[in-house]
């Protein structure tokens, strides 16, 4: 029955029935009857003139059927049994069944039978038409190849052996290998003399190619397609996430015309067979059949000849979304790259191109692009929102309430739900609150029967409550309001879905966290047995999965199955969501549970990449179990000794084990927080630290927790109250902004390491300690400088982070910045008073590290700020010794030693000028030989700008008050630049002395002191506008402590 198929709309018998007896077609539709249609191959040319059409129309009666002319017919299994009224009691096979609809949407069934009911021949098999130049099944291929397939098997066995050795080769390697196997088998086939003669005919040659390709690919399909699936794993997961979010899509949403929707169910069934095809040729034939089904006319009255490419694309888009094929990208790659028997410039190639266009259209986000939040929910593709919230413009109070909830109109929602004032008015008009007189009864009943009353328990035609609508539309601000009005967080709709189900299905993490906070149950199963976690995994919403799992790991049931027996891990593995899988496995999801098909999550893995992730966690779990097993007691030990030992140490062992479990639990909670910080998940951080909106708004008014200043310890004045409130607040989870992991990393450390510039201010304003050290004695500023995160460094320095602290290796933040070549950070640190000649445990200064790492602009910047080239490291090498000969860095370093003394030498001498006019001129002569780097030019412009007045040593120490501010425009116009210093009351001779020096002054070290009134030392400090410095966040490394910057090359 399933082996034969034909287009009944082109069947001569059915066409004749429609043309000659349209009345019968209308009648059978009205009574929802059955039409018997003989297959095309069994019909003779005289069938229209001799056939009695009434005998082919069946009307159901008790326990059997009757034709319109009163004959009895029985349907037994896959056969038609003819009864009373027929001249010959035949048994006619049923080939297949289809359901048709007329223009009034009345349905009737058509049974395609092997031959007409009047047929007398002994043979009952249909003469099914077939394409003589097409092979559809592997059985057809084996029959065509005959004994040649045995020769192919030896080549294929060899391919299997070599593939295992070259499994990690490139895709092109495997394409070539498979093509070589195909070519070799085809060559063997053409060695047959008979087939060689047939190959001269193009049609026969194409048939041979198809046969070889189908056979070869069928035998190596598991190897090749598994590899392709691994290569396309990330693309498949991304595409699946888009299509899963579009399950509410309707045909009208993408412009599918009604006349094209009749064949969509058949096309969908055919497309679902794609993954059962084991060769590119078979997959293409499947796609072609889908296109053919789409373009078939549902009746003679509907002409589909004018179907354009856009109409076909709309239907294909709908099929791609609604057909559950989780590896579209792998299928496309497989078909395009491993089809060897034909070029793409044929009918099959056109079908493939059409599907590619539809898939690319979905990948671009054209169907899933969401408008900004300000545009409301009307343009979003939600769970039928457009149907009743915006498209149904009714005056129903419930519809009005739901519309305001969907659009986030909190004021109107609160007005509609505020019944307290009305109730108070009603009570005041009553004789007394418990009165049941006639007047009071009328008053109360009138209120109860008021159709305009809406409550948090009102429902629409889907069983949705206001909380359902707020959840499905992502209106987190309305969740608090609805719950405060009495909304039930665990209310279910007609499909058994709670608001938490819908929030997880749509991926709204903030709504999910709020519902969990209000005690929404994460274990409620809908009509399909799915929990909210199942839906979050189905649609790939990793944030919602984390919210559900992290809320309460102890009570979250990760291993509960739905009606198919699938756990959340089954679903995530089937759709290839690696992040979701890792979250589930990290929190104890089992990889050994079987669903109703006896499949474990490992067996459901979409590709080998997902499988390897789960296997790795499975092996690590087994190792942890083995390591946690206690050793067996020695049999030689006496019972008395064991009893005595247990009696004396039972309490201590129990308390120790409980403390150990408590510590492990605490560290698990801390790790969750640190992972959320590393991911930049602000909503999860807020939830774990229990920050409210009020906390964020009041963050500007908070003071540092490291050194709070109160009027007295218990003061609650307006100045001290915010800090007292923050310090007194301890989250129920025990987590705070200064908690640390086992390696000493705090949330601020992790945020600094990963460049989370948006989290740094919030953590600091909530009391994070910028001076906290991890196991390597590194502060957050060390990590930010090591990774080159400018905005993070700037925020930490603005929060008074100390720029000269050293870690375990003796490195300062400046040394890390110089080693990494981050010249913007170097300038920023120097501006905030970083010690320029501080050395690490190897004796290397910042200049050493910059020279070793060959960062010419950093070297130049350090020299301009007075870095000493005379400092020796522990190998007795200066920065000059570390530089390469005849390099640009050596050229920079050679200018300074001839005229710049070290800091100690300057202090011992008669405070001579730090840089002479001669060296300034010598240096400026080489200025334009350097690369044209904007930041470097900036410092040249600064040092050649204006005349400066001298300062006393006290004024030098307050150098942050005398910083010139250069605008970005002035940096690009050196002729117009102006540097403004705050003028101090200095003696006239000092001012004239400084004026005579002009541009010949060189920047001074900040540590110099004044020893005589006759000599003044001037320090120039320069501030760079933030807009000049690159502020883009860099990709952070893994969550780990910083490693010591290598300086071994010195």
From Swiss-Prot:
ANK repeats: 396-426, 462-491, 495-524, 528-560, 564-593, 597-627, 668-698, 743-772, 776-805, 809-838, 842-871
Source species, domain of life: Eukaryota
Keywords on record: ANK repeat, Cell membrane, Cytoplasmic vesicle, Endosome, GTPase activation, Guanine-nucleotide releasing factor, Lysosome, Membrane, Phosphoprotein, Protein transport, Repeat, Transport
Annotated effect of mutating residue 513 to D: Disrupts interaction with RAB32
Domain VPS9 intervals: 233-371
Stretches for region Required for interaction with VAMP7: 658-707
Resulting phenotype, residue 684 to D: Disrupts interaction with VAMP7
Renumbered residue ranges of the record's region Interaction with RAB38: 451-600
Region span, Sufficient for GEF activity towards RAB21: 1-372
Consequence when changing residue 509 to A: Disrupts interaction with RAB32
Keyword Repeat: yes
GO process terms (BP): early endosome to late endosome transport; endocytic recycling; endosome to melanosome transport; negative regulation of SNARE complex assembly; neuron projection morphogenesis; positive regulation of dendrite morphogenesis; positive regulation of neuron projection development; protein transport
Keyword Methyltransferase listed: no
InterPro entries referenced in this protein's UniProt entry, alphabetically: Ankyrin_rpt (IPR002110), Ankyrin_rpt-contain_sf (IPR036770), UPF0507/Ank_repeat_27 (IPR051248), VPS9 (IPR003123), VPS9_dom_sf (IPR037191)
Annotated function: May be a guanine exchange factor (GEF) for Rab21, Rab32 and Rab38 and regulate endosome dynamics. May regulate the participation of VAMP7 in membrane fusion events; in vitro inhibits VAMP7-mediated SNARE complex formation by trapping VAMP7 in a closed, fusogenically inactive conformation. Involved in peripheral melanosomal distribution of TYRP1 in melanocytes; the function, which probably is implicating vesicle-trafficking, includes cooperation with Rab32, Rab38 and VAMP7.
Protein name: Ankyrin repeat domain-containing protein 27
């Amino acid at each position: 029955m399933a082996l034969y198929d034909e287009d009944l709309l082109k069947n001569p018998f059915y066409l004749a029935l429609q043309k000659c007896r349209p009345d019968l077609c209308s009648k059978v539709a009205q009574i929802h009857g059955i039409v018997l249609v003989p297959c095309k191959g069994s019909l003779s040319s005289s069938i229209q003139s001799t056939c009695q059409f009434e005998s082919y129309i069946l009307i159901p009666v008790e326990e059997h059927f009757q034709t319109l002319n009163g004959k009895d017919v029985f349907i037994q299994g896959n056969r038609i049994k003819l009864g009373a009224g027929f001249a010959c009691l035949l048994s006619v096979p049923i080939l297949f069944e289809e359901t048709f609809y007329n223009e009034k949407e009345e349905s009737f069934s058509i049974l395609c039978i092997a031959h007409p009911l009047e047929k007398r021949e002994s043979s009952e098999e249909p003469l099914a038409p077939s394409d003589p130049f097409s092979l559809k099944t592997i059985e057809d291929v084996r029959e065509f190849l005959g004994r040649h397939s045995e020769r192919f098997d030896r080549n294929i066995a060899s391919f299997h052996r070599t593939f295992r050795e070259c499994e990690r080769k490139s895709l092109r390697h495997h394409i070539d290998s498979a093509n070589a196997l195909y070519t070799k088998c085809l060559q063997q086939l053409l060695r047959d003399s008979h087939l060689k003669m047939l190959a001269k005919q193009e049609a026969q040659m194409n048939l041979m190619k198809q046969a070889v390709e189908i056979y070869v690919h069928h035998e190596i399909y598991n190897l090749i397609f598994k590899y392709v699936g691994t290569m396309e794993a990330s693309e498949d997961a991304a595409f699946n996430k888009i299509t899963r979010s579009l399950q509410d899509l309707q045909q009208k949403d993408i412009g599918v015309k009604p006349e094209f929707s009749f064949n969509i169910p058949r096309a969908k069934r055919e497309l679902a067979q794609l993954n059962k095809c084991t060769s590119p040729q078979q997959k293409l034939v499947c796609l072609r059949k889908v296109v053919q089904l789409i373009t078939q006319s549902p009746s003679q009255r509907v002409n589909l000849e004018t179907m354009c490419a856009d109409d076909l694309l709309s239907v294909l888009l709908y099929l791609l979304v609604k057909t559950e094929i989780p590896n579209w990208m792998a299928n496309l790659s497989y078909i395009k790259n491993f089809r060897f028997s034909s070029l793409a410039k044929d009918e099959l190639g056109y079908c493939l191109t059409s599907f590619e266009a539809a898939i690319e259209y979905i990948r671009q986000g054209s169907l899933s692009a969401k408008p900004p939040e300000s545009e409301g929910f009307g343009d979003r593709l939600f769970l039928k929102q457009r149907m009743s919230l915006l498209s149904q413009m009714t005056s129903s109070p419930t519809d009005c309430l739901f519309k305001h909830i969907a659009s986030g109109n909190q004021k109107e929602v609160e007005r509609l739900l505020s019944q307290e004032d009305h109730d108070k008015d009603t009570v005041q008009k009553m004789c007394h609150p418990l009165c049941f007189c006639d007047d009071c009864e009328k008053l109360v009943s009138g209120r109860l029967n008021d159709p305009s009353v809406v409550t948090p328990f009102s429902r629409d035609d889907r069983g949705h409550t206001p909380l359902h609508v707020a959840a499905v539309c992502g209106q987190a601000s309305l969740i608090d309001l609805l719950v405060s009005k009495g909304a039930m967080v665990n209310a279910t709709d007609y499909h058994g879905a709670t608001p938490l189900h819908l929030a997880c299905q749509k991926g709204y993490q903030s709504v999910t966290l709020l519902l969990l906070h209000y005690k929404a149950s994460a274990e409620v199963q809908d009509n399909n047995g799915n929990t909210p976690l199942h839906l979050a995994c189905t649609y790939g919403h990793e944030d919602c999965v984390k919210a559900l799992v992290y809320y309460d790991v102890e009570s979250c049931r990760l291993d509960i199955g739905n009606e198919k027996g699938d756990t959340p891990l089954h679903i995530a593995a089937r759709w290839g969501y690696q992040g979701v899988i890792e979250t589930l496995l990290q929190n104890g999801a089992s990889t050994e549970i079987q669903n109703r098909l006896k499949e474990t999550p490992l067996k459901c893995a979409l590709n080998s990449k997902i499988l390897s992730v789960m296997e790795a966690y499975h092996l690590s779990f087994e190792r942890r179990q083995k390591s946690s097993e206690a050793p067996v007691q020695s049999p030689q030990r006496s019972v008395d000794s064991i009893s005595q030992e247990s009696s004396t140490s039972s309490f201590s062992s129990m308390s120790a084990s409980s403390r150990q479990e408590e510590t492990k639990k605490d560290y698990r909670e801390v790790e969750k927080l640190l992972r959320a910080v590393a991911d930049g998940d602000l909503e999860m951080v807020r939830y774990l630290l229990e920050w409210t909106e009020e906390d964020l708004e009041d963050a500007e008014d908070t003071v540092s927790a490291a050194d709070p200043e109160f009027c007295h310890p218990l003061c609650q004045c307006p100045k001290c109250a915010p800090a007292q409130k923050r310090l007194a607040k301890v989250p129920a989870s025990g987590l705070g902004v200064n908690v640390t992991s086992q390696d000493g990393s705090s949330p601020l450390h992790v945020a600094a390491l990963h460049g989370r510039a948006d989290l740094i201010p919030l953590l600091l304003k909530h009391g994070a300690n910028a001076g906290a050290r991890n196991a390597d004695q590194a502060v957050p500023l060390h990590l930010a400088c090591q990774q080159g995160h400018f905005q993070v460094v700037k925020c930490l320095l603005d929060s008074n982070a100390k720029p000269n602290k050293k870690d375990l290796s003796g490195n300062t933040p400046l040394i890390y910045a110089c080693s990494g070549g981050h010249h913007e950070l170097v300038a920023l640190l120097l501006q905030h008073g970083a010690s320029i000649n501080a050395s690490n445990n190897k004796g290397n200064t910042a200049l050493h590290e910059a020279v070793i790492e060959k960062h010419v602009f950093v070297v130049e910047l350090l020299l301009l700020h007075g870095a000493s080239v005379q400092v020796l490291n522990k190998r007795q090498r200066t920065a000059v010794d570390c530089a390469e000969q005849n390099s640009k860095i050596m050229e920079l370093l050679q200018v300074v030693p001839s005229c710049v003394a070290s800091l100690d030498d300057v202090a011992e001498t008669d405070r001579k000028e730090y840089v002479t006019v001669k060296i300034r001129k010598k240096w400026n002569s080489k200025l334009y030989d350097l690369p044209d780097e904007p930041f470097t030019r900036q410092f040249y412009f600064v040092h050649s700008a204006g005349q400066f007045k001298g300062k006393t040593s006290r004024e030098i120490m307050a150098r942050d008050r005398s910083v010139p501010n250069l605008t970005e425009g002035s940096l690009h116009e050196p002729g117009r630049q102006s540097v403004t210093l705050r003028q101090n009351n200095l003696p006239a001779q000092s001012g004239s002395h400084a004026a005579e020096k002009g541009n010949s002054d060189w920047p001074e070290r900040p540590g110099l002191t004044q020893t005589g009134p006759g000599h003044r030392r001037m320090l120039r400090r320069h501030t760079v506008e933030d807009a000049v410095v690159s502020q883009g966040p860099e990709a952070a490394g893994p969550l780990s402590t910083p490693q010591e910057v290598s300086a071994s090359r010195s």
